[in-house]
Design a protein with these regions (language model features):
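NAD(P)+-binding Rossmann beta1-loop-alpha1 motif at the extreme N-terminus of oxidoreductases
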Residues: 1-57, 61, 130, 193-195
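Short, well-ordered alpha-helices that flank and scaffold nucleotide-derived cofactor binding pockets
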Residues: 17, 21, 25, 49, ...
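Internal alpha-helical scaffold of NAD(P)-dependent oxidoreductase catalytic cores
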Residues: 106, 110-115, 131-169, 180-219
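Conserved small/polar residues in nucleotide/adenosyl-binding loops
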Residues: 277-279
Length: 279
């Protein structure tokens, strides 16, 4: 694998900062080989001061010598960025996109470039505890696959899939997943306060219960339903609570919500394709 690659990140937001921190933590490349390009001078200065990377405002100049270009912009800014970068990236460079809904074909057409990885990280990636699902175009070399794997591993766990359709599925399940978890946590905390706990104690109980349950599951070699049954005594409090959740359609609501997110992800992707036709 290439040593000390030149890496340019377009769109220096929170996820981009997580990538920068991870790259430096893993010593994948030195800070002087990392460029963060964005319109805000103060943001570039902040990243330079904190990490020692190079801030740019002109995307075309930023990608000129890049071995890897990471697209980390909002979907609504993608059209402008692709228009700027079309034909500007070295043919042998690897492009990694974390733009939600942007397909390999959309990116390839917009950039006039065909060596592309499409990925979907999630919010915990900002502390190195995320999970990223990714797919590589056929033109990505084995060496670049390994480089992409190391870059995405800076965000937490990573899963390379063989079908790009899995990216829309991942958007609905893991990409949007933290929102479901936070809503569930909020509901549990509010229920605890309703029972009479001070909010501080309710929050502590919920957080540790979730953390401990996940750790416990990962240390067992059984199906998650078996663990649920294990803590559900006939006629007990767990059985009563689960009865009400099932009666309220808890499981169905989750399934339908994730399916709706999946359909919305596909819609957004089609919208991006249509908006980029006129580039």
């Amino acid at each position: 694998m290439q040593e000390n690659p030149n890496i340019t990140i377009i769109g220096p937001g929170a996820m981009a900062e997580a990538i920068i921190a991870g790259l430096l933590r893993q010593q994948l490349t030195p800070p002087e080989n990392i460029i963060a390009s964005g319109p805000r001078i103060e943001r570039g200065a902040e990243l330079h001061q904190h990490y020692g990377i190079q801030p740019y405002q002109e995307n075309v100049l930023a990608v000129k010598k890049a071995d890897v270009v990471i697209l980390s912009v909002k979907p609504q800014r993608l059209q402008k960025v692709l228009s700027e970068l079309s034909g500007a990236i070295k043919p042998e460079a690897l492009v990694i996109s974390i733009v939600a809904g942007a397909s390999i074909q959309t990116l390839a057409d917009g950039l006039n470039h065909h060596c592309i990885v499409r990925s979907m990280p999630n919010t915990p990636a900002q502390i190195g505890e995320g999970i990223t699902v990714w797919y590589a175009s056929e033109t990505v070399s084995d060496e670049q696959i390994e480089l992409a794997r190391q870059i995405l591993a800076a965000l937490g766990q990573e899963i390379l899939v063989e079908d790009e359709n899995y990216l829309d599925m991942a958007t609905a399940l893991s990409g949007t997943g933290p929102a479901y978890i936070f809503l569930f946590m909020e509901a549990l905390m509010d229920a605890g306060v309703h029972l009479g706990f001070p909010r501080r104690i309710a929050e502590q109980l919920v957080i540790q219960t979730l953390r401990g349950s996940v750790d416990y599951y990962e240390n067992q070699s059984v199906h998650v339903a078996d663990l649920r049954n294990k803590v559900t005594s006939p006629g007990g409090t767990s059985a009563e609570a689960l009865y009400y959740l099932e009666k309220a359609g808890f499981r169905t609501a989750i399934s339908r919500a994730i399916w709706a997110a999946y359909e919305r992800s596909k819609e957004l992707g089609k919208g991006l394709e249509l908006s980029l036709i006129h580039i």
